[in-house]
Amino acid sequence: MNRFELLNLLQDTIQDQLVVCNIGLPSQELYKINDRPNYFYMLGSMGLASSIGLGLSLAIKKNVISIDGDGSVLMNMNTLATIGNRAPANYTLLIVDNESYGSTGDQKTFTNERTSLKEVAIGAGCNNVIECSGEETNENLQKAVADKNN
C-alpha cells in the first residue's frame, strides 16, 4: 500500500479532528483526496508538522492528528522527546514510513537500514507506540482516536 492509498483509507476515521499534514507530496495528496476545513497543509517547513500539531494539542482541547513522514521526523527528531514528555492525551502522531525523503527526490532514509522510528519514539518517552502496515493503520488510528474521545 502506498501513501496515497493509505491517506485515502484514513478518511473514514478522520472526522472533526484537526489534522496537520507534512510538507510537499503528502499534503498535496491529502488535499486531492478530500480537502477539509480542519486540515492544515504544512507546505513550507520540512520536519515541523509534528511540532505544529503538538502545539495545537497543547493550546486547545480538540483532538489533533499530525501526519508526518519518516524523512520529516528524522529531520526534527528532538520533537519526539518533547512529545514523549509533554504531549497531552488529545495528540496523535501518525508517521508514514516509506523509507525515503519523498518530497525531495526519493532519496533513501536510514529507516531503510538500521534506524527504527518505533524504537526512537519509545526511547524518547512516547507512550502507546504502535508499528503497523497497510490496512492495520486505519484500525490502529481508529483505536487511538476512540481512546481520546473517552
Please tell me what each predicted stretch does:
Residues 17-35:
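Acidic-glycine-rich active-site phosphate/pyrophosphate-binding loop
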Residues 10, 19-21, 83:
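Generic structural hydrophobic/aromatic packing signal, biased to beta-strands
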Residues 3-6, 13, 32-150:
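Thiamine diphosphate
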